[in-house]
Swiss-Prot record:
<keyword id="KW-0547">Nucleotide-binding</keyword>
<dbReference type="InterPro" id="IPR012003">
    <property type="entry name" value="ATP_PFK_prok-type"/>
</dbReference>
<feature type="binding site">
    <location>
        <position position="251"/>
    </location>
    <ligand>
        <name>substrate</name>
    </ligand>
</feature>
<feature type="binding site" description="in other chain">
    <location>
        <begin position="257"/>
        <end position="260"/>
    </location>
    <ligand>
        <name>substrate</name>
    </ligand>
</feature>
<feature type="binding site">
    <location>
        <position position="13"/>
    </location>
    <ligand>
        <name>ATP</name>
    </ligand>
</feature>
<feature type="binding site" description="in other chain">
    <location>
        <begin position="128"/>
        <end position="130"/>
    </location>
    <ligand>
        <name>substrate</name>
    </ligand>
</feature>
<feature type="binding site" description="in other chain">
    <location>
        <begin position="188"/>
        <end position="190"/>
    </location>
    <ligand>
        <name>ADP</name>
    </ligand>
</feature>
<dbReference type="InterPro" id="IPR022953">
    <property type="entry name" value="ATP_PFK"/>
</dbReference>
<feature type="binding site">
    <location>
        <begin position="104"/>
        <end position="107"/>
    </location>
    <ligand>
        <name>ATP</name>
    </ligand>
</feature>
<feature type="binding site" description="in other chain">
    <location>
        <begin position="172"/>
        <end position="174"/>
    </location>
    <ligand>
        <name>substrate</name>
    </ligand>
</feature>
<feature type="binding site">
    <location>
        <position position="105"/>
    </location>
    <ligand>
        <name>Mg(2+)</name>
    </ligand>
</feature>
<feature type="binding site">
    <location>
        <begin position="23"/>
        <end position="27"/>
    </location>
    <ligand>
        <name>ADP</name>
    </ligand>
</feature>
<protein>
    <recommendedName>
        <fullName>ATP-dependent 6-phosphofructokinase 1</fullName>
        <ecNumber>2.7.1.11</ecNumber>
    </recommendedName>
</protein>
<keyword id="KW-0021">Allosteric enzyme</keyword>
<dbReference type="GO" id="GO:0003872">
    <property type="term" value="F:6-phosphofructokinase activity"/>
</dbReference>
<comment type="subunit">
    <text>Homotetramer.</text>
</comment>
<dbReference type="GO" id="GO:0070095">
    <property type="term" value="F:fructose-6-phosphate binding"/>
</dbReference>
């Protein structure tokens, strides 16, 4: 890639640790003799030509910052052939020979289609708090979000206990229950409602009631968000419990975008640094159109089609763990 640039962008929802990944990609690239161009506002910015060369100074003192210095956006235009054609013209104009994309399944889907249509080498880094990309144990931003949820639930437990209340706490995750399941275990919640293991209201009352009948004077139920309430979010389940078991004092707390912000955890900084450096190594090895992941603490290359098409399974044994420990 003599006299060529590596382009880097962040796309979709932001996740803490993206800046650490930008830093790692930029510094590893420069260390190995490449130049880097940052693309602002994701694919939308690529189409608009919002491109700037990055130096080591540009990425100094960003490892500890949440969000992304390159900004991010969702792009409807890039989903069209016309939009991708405009993006490719910018790639040619800016002399970019390889593109590194940090984002979730939608971002990597865009990268896969772009790579198939044009002769552009694309490397993906898993950046999403949902932790739902197949082929990697962890995604950038997941650990920070998990810690944020646990911190919030700890505070909610204080007020729930003071008032003998049940709180339904809604967290992000879309179609994946990693955040809800693991934050429930880490915070000592009574139950988790996740897409992979839907709980009905009577089961829920069993989990809640057995605690109140013993020594507990509060209950926490962590619920994965449900887009458009197709399967019921925290409000849906809270309303059902209020209606069918009116003796309980029920409240709802939706954590929302709190989960995306804040300084990245040490684990996310290390993960992002490893994945970012590995992306440059992958390019030097001639890899293309793969996501860089981590499995059993080892770097792996996952073809885009696997990362975005396969469902990442949740550890069902954790459902048993939560059930046994919530008595």
């Amino acid at each position: 890639m003599d006299n060529k640039y590596i382009g880097i962008l962040t796309s979709g929802g932001d996740a803490s640790g993206m800046n650490a990944a930008i830093r790692a990609v930029t510094r590893a690239a420069i260390f190995n003799g490449f130049k880097v161009k940052g693309i602002y506002r994701g694919y939308e910015g690529l189409i608009a030509g919002e491109v700037k060369e990055l130096t080591t100074e540009d990425v100094s003192s960003i490892i500890q910052r949440g969000g992304t210095i390159l900004k991010t956006a969702r792009s409807e235009t890039f989903t069209t052939p016309e939009g991708r054609k405009k993006a490719y013209k910018v790639i040619q104009k800016e002399n970019i020979n390889a593109l590194i994309i940090i984002g979730g399944d939608g971002s990597l889907t865009g990268a896969r289609i772009f790579a198939e249509e044009y002769d552009v080498t694309c490397i993906g880094l898993p950046g999403t708090i949902d932790n739902d990309l197949y082929g990697t144990d962890f995604t950038i931003g997941y650990d920070t979000a998990l810690n944020t949820i646990v911190e919030c639930v700890d505070k909610i437990r204080d007020t729930a206990t003071s008032h003998d209340r049940i709180f339904f706490v809604e967290v992000m995750g879309r179609d994946a229950g990693f955040l809800a399941q693991n934050s429930a275990i880490a915070s000592g919640a009574e139950a988790a409602i996740i897409p992979e293991d839907r709980t009905d209201v009577d089961q829920l009352e069993t989990f809640i009631g057995r605690g109140f009948r013993k020594t507990k004077n509060s209950s926490i139920v962590i619920v994965t968000e449900s887009p458009e309430n197709k399967n019921g979010g925290a409000i849906y389940y809270a309303d059902r419990v209020k209606k069918e078991y009116p003796g309980y004092d029920v409240r709802v707390s939706i954590l929302g975008h709190l989960q995306r912000g804040g300084a990245p955890s040490a684990n996310d900084r290390i993960l992002a640094s490893r994945l970012g450096e590995a992306a440059i190594q992958a390019l030097m090895e001639g890899q293309r159109n793969v996501m860089i992941g981590i499995r059993n603490n080892e770097i792996v290359y996952v073809p885009f089609v696997q990362a975005i098409k396969k469902d990442k399974p949740i550890d069902k044994s954790l459902i048993r763990v939560l059930n046994e420990l919530s008595i």
